[in-house]
Amino acid sequence: RGKIRIGVVTGDDILDRLDELLAAGHELRNMDTNEPLATIRDRVLSANAYIGSTPIVQALQQGANVVVTGRSTDTALTMAPLRHEFGWAEDDWNALAAGIVAGHILECGAQCSGGNCLH
C-alpha cells in the first residue's frame, strides 16, 4: 500500500501586498461600483487572487494524490487533473477549451438543473 501524498498550493492570499499594489499605481476598482480600493482599504480584512490550473498540475506532476489549494478558479479543479493525465500543453487551446467546458459543467451543472432553487 502506498501512502497518500498531499500537495499544497498557496499564493492566493494577497492581503499583505495590497499597499504595495496601490503604491505601484494599481487602483483595484470594485467591479460593481467602480470605487477604488483606496477608499475602503482600512476596512479590508481579506484579499485573494484566483489561482489557475498550472500550480495544481505541478503538484500532481510532483506525485501528489490530493492537492489542497487556496482560492482557485472553479474550472481549475477539473482542468488540472485533465491536463496532468492527458499531458495537455498550456497552449493546446482546443483541449483546454474542452477542459474549461467540462469544469464549468461540473461546477454549475446542478444549478442549471434546478439545484439552486429556493422553491
State what each model feature region is:
Residues I14-T69:
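An acidic, phosphate/nucleotide-engaging active-site surface
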Residues N48, T73, W93-A97:
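Short, contiguous, pocket-lining structural segments
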Residues I56-D91:
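Charge-patterned, long linear interaction tracts outside catalytic cores
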Residues G2-I14, T78-H119:
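Catalytic or ion-translocation cores adjacent to nucleophile or general acid/base/metal-coordination motifs
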